[in-house]
Each structure stands twice: as C-alpha cells, then as structure tokens.
Swiss-Prot record:
Record gene name: ribF
Catalytic reaction list: riboflavin + ATP = FMN + ADP + H(+); FMN + ATP + H(+) = FAD + diphosphate
BP GO annotations: FAD biosynthetic process; FMN biosynthetic process; riboflavin biosynthetic process; riboflavin metabolic process
Species whose genome carries this gene: Haemophilus influenzae (strain ATCC 51907 / DSM 11121 / KW20 / Rd)
A Pfam family hit: FAD_syn
Protein name stated in the entry: Bifunctional riboflavin kinase/FMN adenylyltransferase
A molecular function (GO) term: riboflavin kinase activity
EC nos: 2.7.1.26, 2.7.7.2
Source domain of life: Bacteria
Length: 308
C-alpha cells in the first residue's frame, strides 16, 4: 500500500482511481463493508483503490478540545486500511484554507485534478466545501460533467442499530465493551509505545508499563482487565488504568498496564493493548497504601475474569 501525504503529491501518483472519502475512525464493520465493495469495483474497473483521509479530522478542526475522542490514531487507521487491501491512502491536511474551499472547487481541484477520480463511493449524507454547501446531488451533477461514476454507500446496521464511530464511542463510554466489539468487528484496542514513567508502581509491588498516548481525549477511562501483545507476538494478561492518576495528582492522560507473571524489559517497544473487561472507575485514594490495597483487589478481579 502507498501512503501519500498532501493532495499536491497525489497528482504525481494517481492517474485514475476508485475512491472513497471519510474519517474511517475505528475502521468499523460499516467501513469494512464499504471497503470490500470498493475493492470489488476497483478490480472491475482496473483502477487502484484509494481512500482520502483528513488530518486533523474536520470536527477536531472546528471543535478543538471539545471534539469527540478518536477511536484510533492515524497510524492505526493506516494499518487497518492496508489490511483491507487499499492500494493508496491520501492524507490531506484539513486547515483553514481547506475548510473555506468552495464545494465546486473541491470537486474540480481535489477530486478531478489531483486525484483523477473515475469512481467515487460516498455516503448520500456527505457534506463538503465551505459551510458544508456541497452534497451528494452536486457530486452527481459533477460526475456527468467530468466523466466519473458516483454511488452512495448506505448506512449499515447491526441488530437495527446504525454502525457508526459515534455509536462505538457511546458503547465504550457506557462500559459496553461487547457492543463496541460487535460494531467494530474486532475488540477495542490501543496501540502505543512503552515509555519510562516515574516508577511509583514498583514501589508498591505493581510495576507498570506506561503507554504513550498521542491524544489527551480518550473514549475510555478507568481500570480494565487487558491482554497485551508484544512485538514478539507473545500475549500477556494484565490490569490497566486509563486516566490521570488522581491519587498522585496526575495532570496528563496515561495508560498504565501491570502484566501478570512478567519480567521482560519492553521499554521503547510498540505494544497492542486489548480491553477485555471494565473493573471500576478511576478513584482518588486517601493514600498510596489505600491504592495498593485496591490494586491487589483489581488484580484478583482481572485474574478471576480471565479464569472464568
């Protein structure tokens, strides 16, 4: 798969494509269905299959710190898009210039001149251009003028529930990990690099692997039973805390994982943390000793979950 950063670079690579556009946050079951269909159409038309992503995501640009939490960072999206057999991912910078671009300019400059689109699969509720004035009807009209095919990719449902990134965020916020997994088509996971921390956990008998988070707004908070996959492919059970660590007056979001029966040095490694079961919410304890007692209980709860 080829990754292209910046629309200006796409013009040198693409001479026609079957394209879809979106955030693809979570690359959930609905996204996966769209991608399978687009793969089929690209093969039928003998075109490369392309996905256009925006960075930052539009709502992050407009809403700033009030934007919804991401389900996954860009690097992880690209990983799952490659698994879906996408040929080309174009990452376009979403900034003021792009946000103020007129809808007809987006069609002619971005879709036609830069991406040379021949087939476009897009939601019929897709809005684009300054003040969201562009819509599916405008794309249909433009397709006749510029000679490309456009079709709508409808919403997909699971047990009458629309599959969407918003629905998955709500499931995670409600501690319904099973529903989130059903909508995602995979367990909810976070990927990150193990970094050095203040090593307070080892002073109370619970050393932790601290996972760097590239965002301070996350869709989950609290203490969880987790599975951690290392670079080697080994999988270890553990207990994790996602939060600001109020007992030590922490200010930044951090993912801390205590692995059971583990003694390896994994500093600097990329690891995959799969969230299996919510144990409790994050609490500020009166003392470090009280925290230690609770962690002992959390470990027993997690071990009981994995043994059940």
């Amino acid at each position: 798969m080829q990754l292209i950063r910046g629309l200006h670079n796409a013009n040198r690579v693409l001479q026609g494509c079957a394209l879809t556009i979106g955030n693809f946050d979570g690359v959930h079951l609905g996204h996966q269905t769209v991608l399978r269909h687009l793969r089929q159409k690209a093969d039928e038309l003998n075109l490369p299959m392309a996905v256009l992503l925006f960075e930052s995501q539009p709502r992050e640009y407009f809403m700033g710190k009030n934007a919804p939490a991401r389900l996954m960072r860009l690097r992880d999206k690209i990983y799952y898009l490659e698994k879906a057999k996408v040929d080309v991912v174009i990452v376009a910078k979403f900034d003021r210039t792009f946000a103020e671009q007129l809808a007809d300019v987006f069609i002619e400059q971005t879709l036609v001149n830069h991406l040379h689109v021949k087939f476009l699969s897009i939601g019929d509720d897709f809005k684009f251009g300054s003040k969201r004035q562009g819509n599916f009807a405008m794309l249909q009209a433009a397709s006749k003028r510029f000679g490309f095919i456009v079709e709508d990719n409808r919403s997909f449902c699971l047990d009458a529930q629309r599959i969407s990134s918003t629905a998955i965020r709500e499931a995670l916020a409600n501690d319904d990990l099973q529903l989130a997994e059903n909508l995602l088509g995979k367990p909810y996971r976070i990927f990150g690099r193990v970094i050095h921390g203040n090593k307070l956990g080892r002073t109370i008998g619970f050393p932790t692997a601290n996972i760097r988070l590239h965002r301070q707004v996350n869709p989950i908070k609290g203490v969880y039973a987790v599975k951690v996959r290392l670079k080697s492919g080994e999988i270890f059970n553990g207990v994790a805390n996602m939060g600001k660590r109020p007992t030590i007056n922490g200010l930044m979001q951090l993912l801390e994982v205590h692995l059971f029966d583990f003694s390896q040095n994994i500093y600097g490694q990329m690891v995959e943390v799969e969230f299996c079961h919510k144990i409790r919410n994050e609490i500020k304890f009166p003392s470090f000793d009280d925290l230690k007692v609770q962690i002992e209980k959390d470990v027993e709860t997690a071990k009981a979950f994995f043994n059940s």
